[in-house]
UniProtKB/Swiss-Prot annotation:
Organism expressing this protein natively: Shewanella halifaxensis (strain HAW-EB4)
Quaternary assembly: Binds to the N-terminal domain of the chaperone ClpA.
InterPro entries listed in its UniProt record: ClpS, ClpS_core, Ribosomal_bL12_C/ClpS-like
Described purpose of this protein according to its UniProt entry: Involved in the modulation of the specificity of the ClpAP-mediated ATP-dependent protein degradation.
Entry's Gene Ontology BP terms: protein catabolic process; proteolysis
Family from the record: Belongs to the ClpS family.
Protein name: ATP-dependent Clp protease adapter protein ClpS
Gene: clpS
Length: 102
């Protein structure tokens, strides 16, 4: 095997080992008790949405039962879900944040 062929095989092997991480949707679920303003605050604080984006997502949550806050690799999505759920409980709201594979 020539040196060039060997290098090409190594490059192909390395490329095959690197996969894009699985992505996950972070979702806010509607409930009858959490104020709309609090949902907007969550979207701005944890997902860096501007007021217009946050309002659009909040209305989707209100009308459709859930809304996508963002799509992230698993570790980031899991952390955001935990942060949002903890913040909601600290503020005595039943808001539920969850994740699902994108």
């Amino acid at each position: 095997m020539s040196r060039t062929e060997n290098i090409e095989q190594i490059e192909e092997s390395v490329e095959a080992e690197f996969k894009q991480p699985s992505m996950y949707k972070v979702i806010l679920n509607n409930d009858d008790y959490t104020p709309m303003d609090f949902v907007i605050e969550i979207l701005q604080l944890f997902f860096k949405k501007d007021e217009q984006q946050a309002t659009e997502i909040m209305l989707a949550i209100h009308h459709k039962g859930k809304g996508i806050c963002g799509i992230y690799p698993f570790g980031i999505a899991e952390t955001k879900v935990a942060q949002v759920n903890q913040f909601a409980r600290q503020n005595q709201h039943p808001l539920l944040c969850s994740l699902e594979e994108a």
